[in-house]
Amino acid sequence: MEGKTLIVSVLIMSLFMAQNQVDANICCPSIQARTFYNACLFAVGSPSSCIRNSSCLDISESTCPRGYTNDILENTGDAVTEYCKLGCVSSVCGALTILQNSDASEIVNGEVEKCTMACSTVCTKGSMNAVENA
């Protein structure tokens, strides 16, 4: 059971870190494309394959071209609000929810609750102000 808790905790932490890592060379046309790229990179580990499948661009400049405004550094309040509207819980906690449906153990239920609370914390007004001021 402790092994499952560790795996689930690492999965949650990795999903959040993948969305917050500094990677200014990848520009994506939407938040959905950015999320897909990050998930692909985490699962597959091949940046070129993930770029090709997500419609993102790998650029050498520090500014994304027109139409590709969702670079990783664009974590302003508007981007956080849009991410929260699209469903932080469904995108970040989706794998845990599937696991919960197949194995409704106390540990999995607790991890789903922690993931949901993490999304709630990120999506509150106070957290958005902190991101805007950072």
From Swiss-Prot:
Q: Where is the protein localized? A: Secreted
Q: List the disulfide bonds.
A: 27-64, 28-56, 40-50
Top-level taxon of origin? Eukaryota
According to the UniProt entry, its GO molecular function terms are:
toxin activity
The UniProt entry's coiled-coil ranges are none
Q: Name one Pfam family in it.
A: Thionin
**Cellular-component GO terms for this entry:** extracellular region; nucleus
Q: Which residues form the propeptide?
A: 71-134
Keyword entries, A-Z: Disulfide bond, Plant defense, Secreted, Signal, Toxin
Please classify the protein's predominant subcellular localization into one broad category.
secreted
Cited function: Thionins are small plant proteins which are toxic to animal cells. They seem to exert their toxic effect at the level of the cell membrane. Their precise function is not known.
What is stated as this protein's family in its record?
Belongs to the plant thionin (TC 1.C.44) family.
* Protein name per UniProt: Probable thionin-2.4
In the record, what lineage is assigned to the organism producing the protein?
Answer: Eukaryota, Viridiplantae, Streptophyta, Embryophyta, Tracheophyta
